Design a protein with these regions (language model features):
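Bacterial Sec-dependent N-terminal signal peptides
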Residues: 1-29
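Extended, low-hydrophobicity, Ser/Thr/Pro/Gly-biased non-transmembrane segments
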Residues: 32, 125-223, 461, 546-550, ...
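Ligand-binding face of N-terminal immunoglobulin V-set domains in extracellular IgSF glycoproteins
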Residues: 65-86
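A surface-exposed beta-strand-loop module
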Residues: 85-142, 194, 521-534
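Hydrophobic alpha-helical and helix-loop surface patches within well-folded domains
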Residues: 2, 22-23, 68, 91, ...
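Non-catalytic accessory/interaction domains
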Residues: 170-173, 237, 322, 386-389, ...
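Short coil-to-beta strand junction motifs in C2/discoidin
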Residues: 85-90, 163, 493-500
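N-terminal, polar/Ser/Thr-rich
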Residues: 18-65, 92, 136-141, 159-161, ...
């Protein structure tokens, strides 16, 4: 406890002790941000404002200094519990209403007893030293990334999404640096210290703390204008061909803003929209109002990008822009509902990109984007509901995953079909108007949408949103009828209401049948319009609008493969690819048959979305069910050298690179890398050559050091050079060096740039190192709680995926089993992350 500049310490200590007892009894100041504390503050605190100052030295070895003036109103005398995840020595001083007062730094909070606060307006001033973790400091720049509960690591605050506040910011930075934040720059002054500038920013609109943001550093700025609106793009790129993409990026931001303004009927609700494109950024993007962050990996495309890469960038921009309305303007009340912002961002992103790509089958693209990713977690023993319980924001990052990002848009599309497009739009507009600059819940949205339909949306939501998993759906022809049955594989007796479409083919007869699975029935029967004669081929979910495991047998799969090869219906083929792959993963069809059929299908597929799906599924099959690589190498190299579509050649080359094992294949790749001469009509990028260098260093240990040194000398961009220097030791031919890299990754400070750390861990656990790297599994799993505590929201999943994805051995499975046996009470949400990524071992 700090009792600076206070008279009567003995009397005071008694008062504070008494107050502390009251606080402990209330159970409010536990570590993290508990739900009880959040509700308490929301009930008693209001009109919160932050006036923040940070002095940022040029060297990241020097500490940043911060000050915050926090003003608020209290409706009665209550303890003031301010979130700050720091140590006692990081808090330099605290004053309340202009006077020094006693305070306590404990359990990740600064606590001021109720004796010292006033009813009505209070003003707290705190001088502090922020932790570097969420400041993401590099040598020449830094950026804040505070979602979901990391604002409290950077400054003292009320770090909960429903305490929306106004922020004013001042930064003191080196004069050669640029700075950008949520608000526009109002003033830039030089300071009394040479080479330093003081930059002041305009007060923001009401924001949740996780949306507060600033970026400072050596950045290049571009400006673009359309219809009276300006957008600044900040970046660190040095490649002129990549910088030349900035106008196209700005155009897509403008397009997304205009689309949402038209759909919602609400003009862009914030003062500005700036884009900051950063190397090594942890996510695809982050929707900070006025200062939206993007990763350079997805924004600056290679010279000859694939359709997938172009769609990915457009979808990312549309996703983050949609968040301005869904997440920023209207924000979830608590992070158990974080999916309500992600569902809208992804659902609307799929619609916003449609007019940008008129030649793309967007129904197919929707299926391809969301359903496989959702199944990848929903089929596992680590599956979770879309909406999950959350009692403390310290665990909020574990709520994130493919279920909330990818299953939720599929469910939202079902909801739109139930409501109808016009009613859905009316309901969304009412939702945004009702909760403008405020907070909402899924239940609140459902109450609004219920006005526009006679369907029981609450009952529908209970199964699709509040329960985990998916139905197992089978179909057969019996006595001239199509019989479709659903089963809850988890034995809960759940019934998922949904509309499906089947096609039954018997010889020359064919019929398309709508199937309605009701919430009160496990089966559906319909008489066929023709008399079945012999074996029938039953095609499930032909429009891809259903969700579940559409179970087939090995014998039934031959009919699906035949239709896949012969059909011209792109959506049907996409749905069949998913069905066949899911049956591979559920082990109802054989890997050998899957490989052979896929290799026969791929050379003849001209649709780029279907080709990339099939190639990805083939790659997964080869990874999970290893086999002799030589015939596969030959088949893939034939695609690389003969396919008429250049991007198909490039995608096939990347899979060829990952599976190459034979001496001939490795030597071919080495010559290609050494001479920098790509196969005809298969243009390779710098990142392709970097990936080749890692792969060749592992295959050719006697040449590894020279390969790495040569590749490093070829890289010109300073940020990419630093990335390569960090990752390349993970492919060392010397086990002692690799062990040293692994040991270093167990230290939080060495995981600061999370994409680099993930890549290094993946290299350490490459399939070529599988026997040696089994030893890494237990210690890396033991580190998961610390990885979660010190990492950002997607990092625990990235960590365990990098650790386990290349392992297929019995020994690896035994390591995972032994870990769970040793930790029977391991946190459920963290356990699920492991189980999701380990499912292929079982």
């Amino acid at each position: 406890m700090n009792l600076k500049v206070f008279i009567g310490a003995c009397v005071l200590s008694g008062l504070v002790a008494c107050s502390s007892v009251k606080q402990d009894e209330a159970g409010l100041s536990r570590p993290g941000v508990g739900l009880e504390l959040a509700r308490f503050r929301k009930e008693h605190f209001s009109d919160v404002r932050y006036n923040l100052f940070f002095s940022i030295p040029e060297s990241r070895d020097e500490a940043i200094r911060g000050k915050v003036e926090l003003s608020l109103r209290l409706d009665e005398k209550q303890p003031l519990i301010i979130d700050f995840r720091g140590e006692q020595e990081q808090v330099t001083s605290v004053t309340l209403n202009g006077g020094d007062i006693p305070y306590e730094v404990k359990d990740e909070h600064i606590v001021i007893a109720s004796d010292w606060v006033a009813v009505g307006e209070n003003r707290v001033a705190i001088a502090f030293t922020p932790a570097d973790q969420s400041l993401n400091r590099r040598d020449e720049f830094l950026y804040t990334l505070l979602v979901p509960d990391r604002a409290r690591t950077v400054f003292p605050c009320f770090d909960q999404p429903d305490m929306k506040s106004l922020f004013t910011l001042t930064l003191e930075v080196p004069s050669t640096w640029q700075a950008v934040a949520n608000g526009a720059i109002t003033q830039t002054d030089s300071t009394s210290v040479s080479g330093r500038n003081r930059i002041s920013f305009k007060e923001t609109e009401p924001l949740s703390t996780y949306l507060f943001s600033f970026v400072a550093g050596e950045l290049t700025r571009e400006v673009y204008s359309r219809n009276g609106r300006d957008i600044f793009i900040y970046h660190r790129e040095t490649d002129p061909k990549k910088i030349a993409q900035c106008p196209a990026i700005a155009d897509e931001v403008f397009d997304a803003l205009e689309w949402q303004e038209d759909f919602t009927g609400i003009p862009y609700p914030f003062a500005k929209y700036d884009v900051i494109i950063l190397p090594g950024f942890q996510y695809g993007g982050m929707e900070h109002t006025g200062a939206t962050l993007y990763t350079d990996r997805r924004m600056f495309l290679d010279e000859h990008p694939t359709l997938n890469e172009r769609l990915s960038r457009s979808s990312l921009i549309a996703h983050e822009t949609s968040h301005m309305w869904f997440g920023d303007y209207v924000t979830m009340k608590w992070f158990d509902d974080v999916w309500t912002k992600e569902v809208f961002a992804n659902y609307f992103a799929s619609r916003i990109v449609e007019p940008l790509y008129p030649d793309v089958n967007h129904r197919l693209n929707f299926i391809r984007d969301y359903i496989p990713a959702s199944y990848s977690e929903d089929r596992t023993s680590g599956a979770n509901p879309i909406k999950q319980d959350l009692d403390n924001l310290r665990n909020a990052g574990l709520v994130y995953g493919n279920i909330i990002y990818d299953k939720s848009p599929v469910v939202m599309e079902m909801l739109v079909r139930v409501l109808g497009e016009e009613a859905f739009q009316q309901g969304i507009r009412e939702y945004l108007t009702t909760y403008a600059y405020g907070n909402a819940t899924w239940e609140g949205l459902i109450r609004i949408l219920n006005k526009y339909t006679e369907e029981d949306l609450a009952a529908w939501s209970e199964v699709w949103v509040n329960q985990k998993g998916m139905p197992e759906i089978t179909a057969s022809v019996k006595d001239g009828e199509l019989v479709v049955e659903q089963r809850d594989p988890l034995g809960r007796g759940l019934k998922w209401p949904q509309e499906l479409t089947y096609r039954v083919i018997c010889g020359t007869d064919s019929e398309e049948i709508p199937v309605s699975l009701e919430g009160n029935s496990d089966s559906f029967r319909m008489k066929l319009s023709f008399l079945p004669n012999g074996n029938c081929v039953i095609l499930p979910n032909i429009n891809g609008r259903g969700y579940g495991f559409f179970k087939i047998t090995e014998g039934e799969s031959s009919g699906l493969w035949s239709v896949l090869r012969s059909s011209e219906d792109e959506v049907l083929k996409g749905s069949l690819l998913i069905t066949l792959y899911e049956n591979l993963r559920w082990k109802t069809i054989s890997p050998q048959g899957f490989r052979e059929e896929m290799l026969a299908y791929l050379p003849n597929e001209s649709n780029s979305l279907l080709f990339s799906m099939a190639l990805s599924y083939l790659g997964d099959c080869l990874r999970i069910f290893p086999s002799d690589s030589c015939p596969l190498e030959e088949a893939l190299w034939k695609i690389v050298t003969t396919n008429p579509v250049s991007q198909h050649r490039l995608q096939a080359f990347r899979l060829y690179r990952s599976i190459a094992d034979s001496e001939e294949a490795v030597q071919r790749l080495y010559t290609l890398w050494q001479e920098r001469k790509a196969p005809k009509d298969c243009t390779l990028s710098e990142s392709d050559y970097i990936g080749l260098s890692y792969m060749l260093a592992m295959h050719l240990p006697e040449k590894a050091d020279k390969i790495i040194a040569t590749q490093l000398s070829r890289i010109q961009n300073p940020d990419r050079k630093k990335e390569y220097q960090f990752i390349s030791p993970s492919v060392s031919p010397r086990k002692a060096e690799r062990d040293s890299v692994f040991a270093s990754l167990l230290i939080a400070g060495n995981r600061r740039v999370e994409p680099w750390a993930s890549s290094a861990l993946a290299n350490l656990n490459h399939r070529l190192r599988e026997q040696e790297s089994v030893a890494y599994i237990r210690p890396a799993l033991e580190a998961m709680p610390e990885v979660q505590r010190t990492g950002d929201i997607f990092f625990p999943t990235a960590w365990v995926r990098s650790l386990l994805s290349a392992h297929t051995s019995k020994e690896a499975r035994e390591e995972v089993d032994a870990f769970f046996t040793a930790h029977p009470d391991f946190p459920l949400m963290l356990s699920n992350k492991i189980k999701q990524q380990a499912s292929h071992l079982y």
